[in-house]
From Swiss-Prot:
Enzyme class, first EC level, given as a word: ligase
Lineage: Bacteria, Pseudomonadati, Pseudomonadota, Alphaproteobacteria, Hyphomicrobiales
Key words of the record: Aminoacyl-tRNA synthetase, ATP-binding, Cytoplasm, Ligase, Nucleotide-binding, Protein biosynthesis
NCBIfam families linked to this entry: leuS_bact
GO CC, alphabetical: cytosol
Protein name according to UniProt: Leucine--tRNA ligase
Cellular location(s): Cytoplasm
Chain residues that bind ATP: 635
Family (UniProt): Belongs to the class-I aminoacyl-tRNA synthetase family.
Length: 876
């Protein structure tokens, strides 16, 4: 019989309303079932969701719906990471208040997410800019302050003189502010810091316990924490060359074994020796100033040309006072790592080699590969950075690098300079304390007051929240809180005299470092309900982009430890399982070249194919448009597809199914119109097959078949069920999709038989059982279609509340087995035979194999050894 096409515009809102009315995705903390907490990284409310959001939140939703069906009490909340610069930019550019801009964006994005049919517990929703949320964040800040985990110090910052604000290292590009283009200045400002370095070793060691995290992310964090074991070595300075009072220079090195290859020392532009030298030389002063302006991000330092200037200062080699080395100021040495001074061994470090070649400094090889000849081993354009044997190193010659390290360390620890040991062993970390001060309005106010008499005074918890004043203006650069006529003026909580509020706000990474904890009990007066937090945490499955591998995830790991230290939670690690999904990418389209190039949106072109060639044509002008590379969807390249358009045209289930189906979830998915249309055809096919057979299926009782025509149907359904279960457990959604396609192909003919009234009762019962399994399998990915199909075949209740089906173990057992066949103990063939075949059947089948016939050459075997279910050996 003919059936109406599936209409997502009708079905999807209808089922969403039903789920909402029944509050079926609201989670109760006191539910006795085993908990499962699935969370996708919450979005910044930019105003529109993009296809990356669709993929991210669909993946989380599949996990949530699947785990719910498996009997878990699932927590799947949603909120908004709502503070930050874009809202202030909008205020400056469009004259809207950051709060109204943000909440308006939240409303429109929430509506978009709801249309996707996500099984979210919206009753726990919050935005980090809600005073109710940041009040609890201020409470945590005060607890951390009391515990000694927060402190204030003078710190060098990148200052943008046009925007009147501090820039992160990553926001300094070629010495200029990323937004204003102004030359950045270095300023000393008093800033607030979290003591993340107190946890450096623990944060590093605990990475080994995170076995459900991608190895790549763990390695990135390990490198960021950057533990190194080395030696702090004091070098005597030649007093005749020193411009100030300094008598020695302390250098941190991880390679003391290469000391005899040293040809220079290098210090940071902010080192006291550099300041002394700069005070006596305008040239050195200018160079130091240039170093400070260039930015200190690691990316900037890696790519910048290695530059230096000789200070004229000379240092005496620790093992030879007659050997003096020049001390340079260099742009690649950081004051806040080690001691702000290094020694350069050009033969063992590429950066040092480039520097030495540039400034004509000696290059002495001191380590060579074990099998090299010391007479002929030289350093060319590349330093030798491997382990090996020491050469040209006096008493170290012939030792391994490890032995040389120990020999140098032991000697220098005993050697005295000015009455104290010349060296000590040190463990260093690259990780720095987290500076959280931001000179911004749209962030969480730091709850302290500055009093001339009492100093820094915490705001009493009874006075929280310290809320942002709504009446601010953005007509001038800088922080509006500094200019506010009344907000910053307040009485000191201790002495009652006039005092000033802190006008810095917190880094927005603070807001996202504990939100997952707040979701466990967002109604609590305190930051957490420890009982609820300890019940739900860690998050069982956290899903988000690899771009957050370091900062957000590391800060969250620190925050959980700090919250444990202050009694808010009882665990160290916030995320048990981490999944980093790939991006949604799309072809780029453009016309023109160079500066005249204009990017064209996918909606403006059509693709034509002829003779195996694809070309893009502008819909309005018919001109040919250049097809460019496949890149991450971005507004700048205009290669974006609006989820609203896709959902309006095809429905949410098609969009959800497509972003899961086309490639492994950790890889990028290439968006294509053909792929989306293919997904939509599949949606329609599933609906057509089931709805046309609905009358016959509705009247039948579901029962798997043990024999006859229905047996193959039941075996296919139950085997697919078992396999897709494993796929969902591993988040291998694309594999699940492939198996579901196969099952639908298997069910097509028997469903057509039922639709035509040509199936007997046993087959119909088996197909109904299989159809129920199919609907359960697609439900996590295409929940609206699943509900519609379930209702059509006479299913009771909601699929969203139905338990996961159980596969029948007897139906998933493969009826055939493949046995290796050996001849005289060497494998020669494989035999596929019925699992329950007896000894004589196996022997007959083996003797019929060509390879066995050839080996026997007409004679009988001496014996045939059959190890049941394992192997067959023919002795000839």
């Amino acid at each position: 019989m003919a059936t109406e096409r599936y209409n997502p515009r009708d079905a999807e809102p209808r089922w969403q309303q039903q789920w909402e009315a029944g509050k079926i995705f609201e989670t109760k903390n006191d539910d006795p079932r085993e908990k499962y907490y699935v969370l996708e990284m919450f979005p910044y409310p930019s105003g529109r969701i993009h296809m990356g959001h669709v993929r991210n939140y669909t993946m989380g939703d599949v996990v949530a719906r699947y785990k719910r069906a498996r009997g878990f009490n699932v927590l799947h909340p949603m909120g908004w990471d709502a503070f930050g610069m874009p809202a202030e930019n909008a205020a400056m550019e469009r004259g809207v208040h950051p709060a109204s801009w943000t909440y308006q964006n939240i409303a429109s994005m929430k509506a978009q997410l709801k249309v996707m049919g996500l099984s979210l517990d919206w009753s726990r929703e919050f935005a980090t800019c809600d005073p109710e949320y940041y009040q609890r964040q201020q409470h945590l800040f005060l607890d951390f302050l009391e515990k000694g985990l927060v402190y204030r110090k003078q710190s060098k910052v990148n200052w943008d003189p046009v925007d009147n604000t501090v820039l992160a290292n990553e926001q300094v590009i070629d010495g200029r502010g990323w937004r204003s283009g102004a030359l950045v200045e270095q300023r000393e400002l008093t800033q607030w810091f979290f003591r993340i370095t107190d946890f450096s070793q623990d944060l590093l060691d605990s990475l080994d316990t995170l076995d459900e995290w991608p190895e790549k992310v763990r390695l990135m964090q390990k490198n960021w924490i950057g533990r190194s074991e080395g030696l702090s070595v004091r070098w005597e300075l030649d007093p005749a060359t020193v411009p100030g009072e300094e008598k020695e220079l302390t250098v941190y090195t991880t390679r003391p074994d290469t000391l005899f290859g040293a040809s220079f020392l290098a210090i940071s532009a902010d080192h006291p020796l550099a300041r002394d030298a700069a005070a006596k030389s305008a040239e050195i002063e200018a160079f130091c100033e240039e170093c400070r302006r260039a930015g200190t991000s690691l990316a900037a330092l890696e790519t910048a040309e290695k530059m230096g200037i000789d200070t004229g200062i000379r240092a005496r080699h620790p093992f030879d006072p007659d050997w003096e080395l020049p001390v340079y100021v260099a742009n690649f040495v950081l004051m806040d790592y080690g001691t702000g001074a290094i020694f350069g061994c050009p033969s063992g470090d590429q950066r040092d080699l480039d520097f030495a070649r540039k400034y004509g400094l000696p290059v002495v090889p001191v380590v060579m590969p074990k099998d090299a000849d010391p007479q002929t081993f030289t350093i060319g354009d590349e330093a030798y950075v491997g382990d090996g044997v020491m050469i040209n190193s006096r008493f170290l010659d012939g030792l391994s690098t490890e032995e040389a390290f120990e020999t140098i360390a032991t000697r220098l620890e005993k050697d005295l300079l000015n009455g104290t040991p010349r060296a000590e062993r040190k463990v260093n970390f690259r990780l720095r304390d987290w500076g959280i001060s931001r000179q911004r309005y749209w962030g969480c106010p730091i709850p302290v007051i500055h009093c001339d008499d009492c100093g820094v005074v915490p705001v009493p918890k009874t006075d929280l929240p310290v809320t942002l004043p709504p009446d601010v203006t953005f007509d001038k650069p800088g922080n509006p809180l500094d200019r506010h006529p009344t907000w910053r003026h307040v009485a000191c909580p201790q002495c009652g005299k006039d005092a000033r509020r802190e006008t810095d706000t917190m880094d927005t990474f603070v807001d996202s470092s504990w939100y997952f904890t707040r979701f466990t009990a967002p109604w609590e007066d305190g930051p957490t309900d420890p009982k609820a937090a300890n019940h739900w945490l860690p998050v069982d499955q956290y899903i988000g982009g690899i771009e957050h591998a370091i900062l957000h995830l590391l800060y969250s790991r620190f925050f959980t430890r700090a919250m444990k230290a202050t009694g808010h939670v009882a665990l160290d690690e916030p995320f048990k399982g981490l999944f980093t999904q790939g991006m949604v990418v799309h072809e780029t389209y453009s016309r023109g070249e160079g500066a005249q190039r204009e990017w064209i949106t996918p909606a403006e072109i059509r693709i034509e194919e002829a003779d195996g060639q694809r070309r893009a044509v502008h819909i309005e002008t018919s001109e040919e448009i250049a097809i460019g590379s496949i890149e991450k969807m971005s507004k700048s390249k205009k290669n974006v597809v609006d989820p609203d358009d896709i959902i309006a045209s095809y429905g949410a289930d098609t969009a959800r199914f497509f972003v899961l189906s086309d490639s492994p979830p950790d890889r990028d998915v290439i968006w294509s119109e053909a792929g989306v249309e293919g997904a939509h055809r599949f949606v329609q096919r599933v609906w057509r097959l089931l709805s046309e057979a609905a009358e016959g299926l509705s009247a039948a009782e579901a029962a798997p078949a043990r024999e006859g025509e229905g047996l193959a149907v039941s075996q296919a359904a139950h085997r697919t069920l078992k396999a897709v279960e494993a796929d969902y457990d591993k988040l291998a959604f694309n594999k699940a999709v492939a198996r579901i396609y196969e099952l639908v192909n298997t069910l097509a003919a028997p469903l057509a038989q039922i639709a035509a009234g040509k199936a007997d009762q046993a087959l119909t019962a088996a197909v109904k059982d299989a159809a129920g399994i199919l609907i359960s399998l697609i439900a996590p990915m295409m929940p609206h279609l699943a509900e519609e199909c379930w209702r059509a075949i006479g299913g009771k209740g909601l699929i969203a509340e139905r338990p996961w089906p159980k596969f029948d173990a007897t139906l998933v057992v493969e009826n055939e087995i493949t046995l290796p066949v050996q001849i005289n103990g060497k494998k020669r063939a494989d035999l596929t035979i019925a699992r329950d075949a007896d000894q004589s059947a196996i022997e007959s089948a083996v003797l019929a194999l060509d390879v066995v016939k050839t080996a026997l050459n007409g004679s009988n075997p001496k014996k045939i050894i059959v190890v049941p279910q394992r192997i067959v050996n023919v002795v000839v």
